[in-house]
Each structure stands twice: as structure tokens, then as C-alpha cells.
Swiss-Prot record:
Natural source organism: Plasmopara viticola (Downy mildew of grapevine)
Secretion signal, residue range per the UniProt entry: 1-21
Motif (RxLR-dEER) on chain: 43-58
Superkingdom of this protein's organism: Eukaryota
Lineage of source species: Eukaryota, Sar, Stramenopiles, Oomycota, Peronosporales
Location of this chain's protein in the cell: Secreted; Host nucleus; Host cytoplasm
Major location category of this protein: secreted
Protein name: Secreted RxLR effector protein 149
Length: 270
């Protein structure tokens, strides 16, 4: 049984490496189509197609997680393990969980690298926000990397700084919500939307449709939070519906958004 676990673990590690290498290579090749040069002659990466990024994540999970989870459920009899190795990192009883943790770490790393391509510069970050990228999604990736790494990640400080910057920038967009009367800087976002590629516009539309469906269902704040509905896309939806042009008759909708932003931030910081 022990030899079987060892052989299967080695096979899975090799297979996982091949799959991830092919996915990363494909992603890198495709991303060259999005490369441009700025006015200083430096190469920059513009936002990739959000749909392609989600598809790549699904492909990785479908290719790796089922097998990894199956390994994680393997039970190795303690009798099959020499007593001298029970407390060692080489203990075969610990291998299934270690393999599963390693796969989850790889997937989190791939997600982070894909997201870096969509958040190069403030405009790209704003486009990502419009397409529904939420602080909680980034927090999950950050936590997975920290949790499943066998030691402190070499780029821990950079990951934390990038996350903190995104969160600060994200909630900074709600300042106008607390003015009297509440306002929304529509011109900036409309101009940014006009400059989007068709793929980005489609991602923007899908994010708005998702929020619209759930808001129209009358879901509670807790239900919206459980679905990780973007407070920013929610605010843009209200603007598109003319709520901020008629504040007096729409204060109930604005107050609901304020409550949601408050709850969302509280849970995020918890």
C-alpha cells in the first residue's frame, strides 16, 4: 500500500507539472497579443480577456483538483509505516495531504499571475473593478498562497502590498456615496468604458447582469455577500438606473448600498 501511494504521488506530481507548464506556456503566448509600448519605450501589459482567464482557471481546476482530492482521501495504514518515520516529513501518511496542498498552492499562484496581467496601472485596475474583480476574491488567493506554502513565500510583502493597494483603491470609489447629496463620478467611468476592448466590454456587461439579477431578486445583504456581489458594480448599476439623478426618491436604494458596503468591508477586515 505504501509503495502504491508513493508511485501514485510521484506520477501525479509529474503529471501536474506537465499540465501547469502547458497552461502557463499557452497563457504566456496568448498574452503577447496584449503587449503594447508606453511613451517611454517600456513594454506594458494591457488587460487580458477576462473570459479567457476564467476559462484557464476552470481548465486547471478540472485537470488537477479531482485527482489531487482523490489522493488527499487515501488512507495509509499506520502499520505500513515504519515507526521511525511517523514523525518525519517523509512519513507516507502525510503525503496525500501535502500533494493536495501543493496543487492548491499552484492554482493560487497561477490565478495571481493571471490577475497581474489585468492590473498593470491604475486604469487596468479600474477596468478589473468594472468587470467584477472583488477584494474578497483577491483575499482568497492571498490566503491560499500563505496557507499552503510550506514556508514564508519569497514575495509575501509584495503580495500583501498589492492586495492592500487594491482594497484601498476599491473602497476609495465610495467617497461620493457619503456626500450630501450622494454623487457618483460617472464621467470617468463612462470614458473608461468607451476605451475598453470588446472582450472587456463583454466582461463588464456580464458583471453588471449578475449584480442586476441578484438585486432584482430582492436578496438580503447577507445573501448578496455570500455571492460576493461587487459593491462597486452594484453602485454603477444604480447610476445606470438613474438613482443618483433623483436622490430624493431613491434614498432607500442608496441606503441599502451603503449598508452593503459597510457589511462587505467589515467582513473583509475581520
Amino acid at each position: 500500500m505504501r509503495n502504491g501511494v508513493v508511485l501514485f504521488g510521484l506520477f501525479f506530481i509529474g503529471y501536474s507539472s506537465c499540465v501547469l507548464a502547458s497552461l502557463v506556456e499557452k497563457s504566456d503566448v496568448e498574452s503577447t497579443h496584449a503587449e503594447q509600448w508606453d511613451s517611454n519605450g517600456k513594454r506594458t501589459l494591457q488587460a487580458d480577456d477576462p473570459e479567457r482567464i476564467l476559462a484557464e482557471e476552470r481548465n486547471m481546476e478540472q485537470a488537477l483538483l479531482p485527482a489531487a482530492e482523490a489522493i488527499g482521501k487515501i488512507k495509509v495504514s499506520e502499520k505500513a509505516v515504519p515507526r521511525a518515520s511517523l514523525g518525519s516529513t517523509l512519513n507516507p501518511m502525510k503525503w496525500p495531504k501535502r500533494i493536495l496542498d501543493k496543487v492548491r498552492l499552484w492554482l493560487a499562484r497561477i490565478r495571481l499571475n493571471l490577475l497581474k496581467r489585468t492590473t498593470v496601472g491604475e486604469d487596468s485596475i479600474d477596468r478589473a473593478m468594472m468587470n467584477g474583480l472583488t477584494p474578497f476574491y483577491l483575499k482568497k488567493i492571498k490566503n491560499d498562497i500563505m496557507h499552503y506554502s510550506s514556508s514564508v513565500p519569497h514575495d509575501k510583502i509584495k503580495i500583501e502590498e498589492d492586495y492592500d493597494f487594491y482594497v484601498k483603491h476599491f473602497f476609495g470609489q465610495f467617497k461620493g456615496l457619503y456626500k450630501d447629496p450622494p454623487v457618483f463620478a460617472v464621467d470617468k467611468w463612462n470614458k473608461l468604458e468607451e476605451g475598453m476592448t470588446k472582450a472587456e466590454q463583454n466582461g463588464n456587461r456580464r458583471a453588471s447582469d449578475k449584480v442586476s439579477r441578484n438585486i432584482d431578486k430582492g436578496l438580503s445583504i447577507d445573501q448578496l455577500f455570500s455571492l460576493d456581489i461587487s459593491p462597486f458594480v452594484y453602485m454603477r448599476l444604480l447610476e445606470k438606473r438613474g438613482v443618483f439623478k433623483d436622490v430624493e426618491n431613491n434614498m432607500d436604494k442608496i441606503d441599502h448600498l451603503k449598508d452593503y458596503v459597510k457589511v462587505y468591508k467589515e467582513h473583509l477586515m475581520a
